[in-house]
């Protein structure tokens, strides 16, 4: 299920574009997640009160959290699958503290793909989309394995 060197290159090429505005991309990803899957908003006490897209766009806290999410994901992607050290604390906090189901990680993966498609169509063609999907699936599978070790049925 690993990615080829060429696939990792496609992932990291588009990720370079994301890093030019992590907070903006992250905010868009979270807004897309909350719009497509409103139930996910319930896991975020800090954002539950944000009812409209305009409120979400105006939230500095949402922007900061988007930056945090994509900074962590970027660190994981740059490890090209050798991300056990990065995954462990993330799985621990998402399983024991936040109680985030794996399904929600699938939802945010979809949101990431959609935001990249809309913001970077020239750098995110079918090959890059396929590579990013594989990279995000690898991440989710490894988080799910850690969840299982922790006894979390997410």
From Swiss-Prot:
Residues 2-148 form the Globin domain. Keywords: Cytoplasm, Heme, Iron, Metal-binding, Muscle protein, Oxidoreductase, Oxygen transport, Phosphoprotein, Transport. This is Myoglobin. It catalyses: Fe(III)-heme b-[protein] + nitric oxide + H2O = Fe(II)-heme b-[protein] + nitrite + 2 H(+); H2O2 + AH2 = A + 2 H2O. SUPFAM superfamilies: Globin-like. The keyword Heme applies. Nitrite binds at residue 65. PROSITE patterns: GLOBIN. It is found in: Cytoplasm, Sarcoplasm. Heme b binds at residue 94. The modification Phosphoserine is found at residue 4. Its EC number is 1.7.-.-, 1.11.1.-. One of its GO terms (biological process) is removal of superoxide radicals. The lineage of its organism: Eukaryota, Metazoa, Chordata, Craniata, Vertebrata. It comes from the Eukaryota. GO terms for molecular function: heme binding; metal ion binding; nitrite reductase activity; oxygen binding; oxygen carrier activity; peroxidase activity.
